[in-house]
A protein has these predicted regions:
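Membrane-interface interhelical connector segments
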Residues: 191-207
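Membrane-interfacial loop-to-transmembrane alpha-helix junctions, especially the N-terminal start
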Residues: 39-40, 97-110, 237-245
Length: 308
């Protein structure tokens, strides 16, 4: 009886699919907030307008038709705009496009500072050749502010704030500044109302009202107080507003110290007591400002970003 010899079955080797090559490590790229293109374009236009106005103000002082002290104040303000505010805003715009959250706060604050001074220039300075630029700056600053605010996620900012940030101390600082300057301005206004005269800040000037007091009491100080209260209560909008107002107040303190010094240079009869006060205020305000900005934990994202 013959048997057929069968070879043992060949066991097929099962191969694992080849592993894809490991990509080289790459540095994560931060993502810009969606919709920043419009804010960028408006802010670039704002920077160009203010740069032109600043250069003319600093190097062609005869453009002003105001008394020497007030013209000196304006030159001091535009010196700060040229040397501090505009470089800070351009740097913040560059960083924001690359996704740095804290840069948005600096950008907002710089726009707010330029808006503040556009209002002062438009309504306080005597009509001069730069008036169209003052109006253009006012319009562009408002548009830039609105466009940028639409791009910022206050909730993300709040979630990214480090628990190490002394929020109650920062909030208290903001509320003290708001209440303190409100009392200072009211001390100038209320006695004049009761006596039926003009405030002391207007005596010896050609101004009909004090535009600084108007802007501060109507906008700056209420926003500063709201920032402090909301931050104290842990609201997301408080983080956005507090960070913005901290940078703004520091910029404004530097600006006032500088414009008062330039006013004294133009008219030595003008006191310099405010210079030292605002230098100290700027130095003190820089401490919570830096601590707050450093306390924002920057997120890392994928390699692409969409900008509308």
């Amino acid at each position: 009886m013959s048997t057929t010899r069968r070879d043992p079955p060949v066991r097929r080797r099962r191969f694992a699919p080849p592993m894809p090559p490991t990509p080289p490590p790459s540095r994560p790229v931060r993502v810009a907030p969606p919709g920043t293109t419009l804010a960028l374009r408006l802010s670039i236009a704002l920077a160009v307008v203010d740069a032109i106005a600043g250069l003319v103000s600093v190097f062609v002082p005869d453009v002003f038709r105001d008394d020497p002290a007030y013209a000196g104040n304006a030159r001091g303000t535009y010196t700060v705009i040229l040397l501090v505010a505009l470089p800070a805003m351009v740097l913040a715009m560059w960083a924001s496009v690359r996704g740095w959250l804290r840069a948005n706060l600096v950008w907002l604050a710089c726009i707010g500072y330029l808006l503040y001074n556009a209002i002062l220039s438009s309504f306080s300075l005597r009509f001069n050749a730069l008036f169209p630029l003052y109006v253009a700056s006012l319009s562009l600053a408002v548009a830039s502010l609105v466009a940028l605010l639409r791009c910022i996620d206050a909730g993300m900012l709040a979630r990214r704030l480090s628990p190490r940030v002394p929020v109650h101390a920062v909030a208290a600082y903001l509320m003290v500044i708001a209440v303190g300057f409100a009392l200072l301005w009211l001390a100038d206004i209320v006695p004049a109302l009761l006596a039926g005269t003009v405030p002391a800040s207007l005596r010896g000037t050609t101004l009909t009202t004090n535009a600084v007091e108007v802007i501060d009491l109507a906008f700056t100080l209420p926003l500063t107080l709201a920032a402090g209260l909301w931050l104290w209560r842990g609201r997301a909008m408080g983080v956005l507003l507090a960070g913005t107002m901290l940078v703004f107040l520091t910029l404004e303190a530097i600006s006032v110290a500088t414009d008062q010094y330039f006013g004294h240079l133009a008219d030595p009869s003008q006191p310099t007591s405010a210079v030292a006060f605002f230098v100290v205020l700027a130095a003190v305000g820089a401490l919570p400002t830096v601590a707050f900005l450093r306390g924002i934990i920057e997120p890392l994202h994928g390699p692409t970003a969409r900008r509308a």
